[in-house]
Amino acid sequence: MHGRNKYKSTGVIQWMLNNGWPSLIWHLYDFYLQPAAGYFGTKKACEPLHIQYSYDNRSVVVVNSSNLDVGELTAEATLYDFNLQRRFSRKVRLASAADSVQSVCDIPADNIDTDVYFVHLILLDKAGDVLSRNFYWLPKKLSTFDWSLEQARQHPYYTAVTRYEDLSMLNRLTKVHLDASASIQRAPGEEDIRVQIRNPSENLAFMVHLSVVDGKTGEEILPVLWEDNYFSLLPGESRAVRAHYNSAIPHARLRLEVNGWNIDAQTALVDEVANGANR
């Protein structure tokens, strides 16, 4: 919501960025430089051109935080119930002025009869390439808070929750198996791993997590700078994700590990493609 109201809100505090020592406390990336899901959520929220949903009024907007006008855009918003039945879809053509917030639509979720539902947002350029995407899993009823002065005096550092939102239906998501492959992409001065991943099932693949490991030891290779991670794939949806790494481990020992909330864990070989082919 801050992006939508950036000139009205008082600001955003990020706590905390990383751990100065091995710890289980919250972070965007830990002592070992392993990024958590929050890192990729924050990265997405900071896109200069960003499509987002607002929890307070169910609005969808395009936030342009750059100093450039961007024209000939298409914003797509789709509402699914928990069973992935499409309940609403809207496609809007728009232009986004520099430093602006452009309204797309409101999500009519009042008629959803499942306790959890999903909102899928995509922003495309005139060539049909994805500029921004977002996927939300939402409760039918949001958490409620105690904003009273008495509560503030007793607990000045946090706002008490009087009722928590219920997302327990996510535990009932059907298991899925993904098609995944990985290859090394070389270019002058850099070396990347490119992952192709697809959800061939009729079910949602929720919170897909990718990692690169040493096939000999099983240890995760860190740091790896992932383009995106902890994302979700709708039925039939595919994604190409690139990761940059710097490791002395021989290529033959590299493995891609794929897992997630409701995803069968698997390990794939990393093929070598020289000279930046298929980049």
Which role does the model predict for each range below?
Residues M1-D228, L233-A243, H251-L256:
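Carbohydrate-binding surfaces of carbohydrate-active enzymes
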Residues L17, I263-A265:
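Residues that form or immediately flank small-molecule/cofactor binding pockets and catalytic motifs
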Residues A265-D271:
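Eukaryote-biased activation of long, low-complexity terminal tails and linkers
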Residues E272-G276:
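Mature N-terminal, pre-catalytic/accessory segment of carbohydrate-active enzymes
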